[in-house]
Amino acid sequence: MPTPEPEKPANPTLHAVIRKVFAAAEKGFSLDVDFTAAAGFTVIFGPSGSGKTTLLDCVSGLTTPQAGRIAIAGRVLFDASNQTNVPVAKRSVGYVFQDLALFPHLTVEQNAQYGLAQLPRPQRRERVAALLRDFRIDHLSRRRPTEVSGGERQRVALARVLVTDPCALLLDEPLAALDAATKSKIIDDLRRWNEAHRIPILYVTHSREEVIALGERVLVMENGRIIAQGTPHQVLSAPLQETVAQLAGFENIFDATVWLTHEDRGTLTCRLPTGQPSGFVLLETPLIRAEPGSRVRVGIRAGDILLATVKPEGLSARNVIAGQLVSLERRDMMISARVNCGVEMEVHLTLASRDALQLTPGREVWLVIKTYSCHLMQR
């Protein structure tokens, strides 16, 4: 008689303390994290090589930490202190890899049934049919993976994992290879499924759009450590670390020195060095606790900068900076303009703005930057 699966708790929480050091001959890398993931989406966000996949591998059991503890709703999967290490097959943790690894000789329905051999056939078919409906691929049940689209194959992979009724779900960049429209539809399906089932879902991505669309909570990783966490708005809107700022879409990041503090009006004046003798750009930023002479980093999103071809007046924005247009580069339906104003800044424009302003390299322009578009970060 097959061993019954552990009963899934009504509202599980995943807690993990993981310490893993790889030898230099392997990765020369260490993972050191401590986090809690409640039922729902927790997005693991960070640059390549930051340890996102290694974290998932440790939770799944594919990689064994040297120290730490991993538990879901109190059920301990790993505990180095007493040598507990539940095998992968008994953890009841679903894992969808970047490589979908569907069986090409099996139909969509057969692929989805693969992990249910212990169930009677009628029960298998009923459970699979429900998942295929949830992910809108029930009409493809008799087709093979080579006969469906990339987005449909991804839905099959999700159904195959979820049909086993896991206590937690690990998703390693599952939508990376898909176009934006297909990605959006699958995200909608995942969100709808999650609303009904509410298990901890760790979702690895490089995409800021996916963080915003899916993330109830986001953990940002760098060099095997969690460097920021919170809601997407908390983490991405005003980042405190340069790595987070880059991931959050702050294209302009500069070294600066606090020159003046204006406590009466809640601002600082910062100096950005230009690389020229005695040259600098002045930038008014929000007030923080910093003494004149302190070194800071300033981040500005390219989409938060206005560009004018005549010097504007009568504005609430505190920063109006003259410069010269260096280049214009079309990126899909957007223009990336680079402007030299002592430091080089990137500005994002619409195609219509470029045409209306008759912009060409070499033209004199002015950049308009609001004080609260300037974010100060740790150095």
Language model regions located:
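Conserved ABC ATPase "signature" region
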Residues: 75-80, 123-140, 191-192
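ABC ATPase NBD coupling module
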Residues: 77-94, 118-121, 125-126, 239
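Short coil-to-helix segment of the ABC ATPase nucleotide-binding domain corresponding to the Q-loop/switch region
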Residues: 106-113
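Conserved ABC ATPase signature
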Residues: 144-148, 152
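A short, proline-enriched helix->beta-strand linker immediately N-terminal to the Walker B motif
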Residues: 163-167
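Internal alpha/beta loop-helix hairpins
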Residues: 195, 205-275
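Glycine/charge-rich catalytic "coupling/switch" loops of P-loop NTPases
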Residues: 276-329, 348-379
